[in-house]
């Protein structure tokens, strides 16, 4: 079975906790704080692998978590960073945030990587909090939790040439004759329900990858037939070979079929309508093909190269393969492949925090304050006092008062709730 969609959960490693330790050594009076920092959590990284062809591995395992950072220790020993978790995906995989639909990465080249969940920062040890007013702090930060999210993975095959056309036009038979691909072939519509890849080798030593795309029908751009499931696989190809049932053996008109298929490609993605293509006038061994070939040449011969072929007998396939190979030499290798895309680092201007009231609870939002809260050891009185100073310094307390907070009201910051005391 061919799997070209998957949904997975990824979580970066949590940062290690900072350490509270005091230096106690002979001949070292007033040793002072000596607690080391926690290590950073590992990142979750997706890496494109040209040797993979489907997303089937994600059918059996959907949750991935990187290693957390080690905790800090005494003697100012910092914890080791967590190891990154590298997940291999097929080249051509598009990565999106499942919740927002945001495009995170488009991994199109072998070895290309994208960080999809960053590890949390390690907490600072008590040695970091020495001030002239507090020479012996007995508090440390907890490690920051790693990023977590659900991802939608979508594979768009990477092939040089795409075979397109109506069902039963002979695409699968053609690819089986010019390559070692062995797709299922039968005389009923939609025999091919998954894309097939084959390497076509030319006598002069050149080769290219050909993809047999399941048959398209009118309305495919709206999802009719196999529609959206496989139209996206055509997007990566550099050249299209339009396979037509020239004999009209299925009761269709090849001249009209060509128009319909090209219209569907353009409606799905306008760039596909401009993609270079040649016509493989197939089934020339059947009655009626010669007459329709003449009509095709009259209608499209001035704009497209037309090759009379028979995938069954092999007629004309050598000339088609040689010409396709020559055309690929003229088309840049990356012409249909987008520039490598990875989630950019965005610095958003705006307020450091927000304050609002919902159902009697005061909600404080903001990445900075939420990080301070989650990294504070709320069981440590000294750490809580530091958090209160941060809240006042950021202006959050003043904003809460302006919002009408009273003694005993509940304040929620991230996943934590506090009681406001004047």
Curated annotation (Swiss-Prot):
Subunit: Monomer.
Entry's Gene Ontology molecular function annotations: GTP binding; GTPase activity; magnesium ion binding
Major location category of this protein: cytoplasm
Protein name as annotated: GTPase Obg
Cofactors demanded by this protein: Mg(2+)
Single GO BP term: ribosome biogenesis
Domain Obg: 1-158
Binding site for GTP: 165-172, 190-194, 212-215, 282-285, 310-312
Residues that, per the record, bind Mg(2+): 172, 192
Family per similarity comment: Belongs to the TRAFAC class OBG-HflX-like GTPase superfamily. OBG GTPase family.
Annotated HAMAP family: GTPase_Obg
Role summary: An essential GTPase which binds GTP, GDP and possibly (p)ppGpp with moderate affinity, with high nucleotide exchange rates and a fairly low GTP hydrolysis rate. Plays a role in control of the cell cycle, stress response, ribosome biogenesis and in those bacteria that undergo differentiation, in morphogenesis control.
Location of this chain's protein in the cell: Cytoplasm
Boundaries of every OCT domain copy: 337-422
Family matches, as SUPFAM superfamilies: Obg GTP-binding protein C-terminal domain, Obg GTP-binding protein N-terminal domain, P-loop containing nucleoside triphosphate hydrolases
A Pfam family hit: GTP1_OBG
GO CC annotation terms, alphabetical: cytoplasm
Keyword vocabulary terms for this entry: Cytoplasm, GTP-binding, Hydrolase, Magnesium, Metal-binding, Nucleotide-binding
OBG-type G domain location: 159-329
EC number: 3.6.5.-
Cysteines joined through disulfide linkages: none
């Amino acid at each position: 079975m061919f799997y070209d969609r998957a949904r997975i959960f990824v979580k970066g490693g949590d940062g290690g906790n900072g350490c509270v330790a005091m230096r106690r050594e002979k001949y070292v009076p007033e040793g002072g704080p000596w607690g080391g920092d926690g290590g950073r959590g590992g990142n979750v990284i997706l890496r494109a692998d040209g040797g993979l062809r489907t997303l089937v591995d994600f059918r059996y395992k959907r949750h991935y978590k990187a290693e957390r950072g080690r905790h800090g220790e005494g003697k100012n020993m910092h914890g080791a960073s967590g190891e990154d978790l590298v997940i291999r995906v097929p080249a051509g995989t598009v990565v999106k945030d499942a919740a927002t639909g945001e495009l995170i990465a488009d991994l199109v080249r072998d070895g290309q990587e994208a960080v999809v969940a960053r590890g949390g920062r390690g907490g600072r040890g008590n040695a970091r909090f020495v001030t002239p007013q507090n020479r012996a702090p007995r508090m440390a930060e907890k490690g920051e939790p790693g990023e977590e999210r659900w991802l939608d993975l979508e594979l768009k095959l990477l092939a040089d040439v795409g075979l397109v056309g109506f069902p039963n036009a002979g695409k699968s038979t053609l690819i089986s004759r010019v390559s070692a691909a062995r797709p299922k072939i039968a005389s009923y519509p939609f025999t091919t329900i998954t894309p097939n890849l084959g390497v076509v080798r030319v006598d002069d030593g050149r080769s290219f990858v050909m993809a047999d795309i399941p048959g398209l029908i009118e309305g495919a751009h709206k999802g009719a037939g196999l529609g959206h499931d496989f139209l996206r696989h055509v997007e990566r190809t550099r050249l299209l070979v339009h396979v037509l049932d020239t004999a009209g053996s299925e009761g269709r008109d090849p001249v009209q079929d060509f128009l319909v298929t090209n219209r569907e490609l353009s409606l799905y993605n306008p760039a596909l309508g401009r993609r270079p293509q040649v016509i493989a006038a197939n089934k020339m061994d059947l009655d009626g093909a010669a007459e329709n070939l003449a009509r095709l040449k009259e209608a499209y011969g001035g704009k497209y190269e037309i090759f009379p072929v028979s995938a069954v007998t092999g007629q004309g396939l050598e000339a088609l393969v040689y010409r396709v190979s020559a055309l690929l030499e003229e088309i840049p290798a990356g012409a249909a492949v987008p520039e490598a895309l990875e989630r950019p680092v965005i610095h958003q201007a705006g307020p450091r925090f927000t304050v609002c009231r919902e159902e009697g609870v005061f909600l404080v939002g903001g990445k900075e304050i939420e990080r301070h809260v989650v990294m504070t050891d709320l069981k440590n009185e000294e750490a809580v006092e530091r958090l209160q100073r941060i809240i006042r310094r950021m202006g959050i307390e003043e904003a809460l008062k302006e919002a009408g907070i009273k003694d005993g009201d509940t304040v929620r910051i991230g996943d934590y709730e506090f009681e406001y005391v004047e």
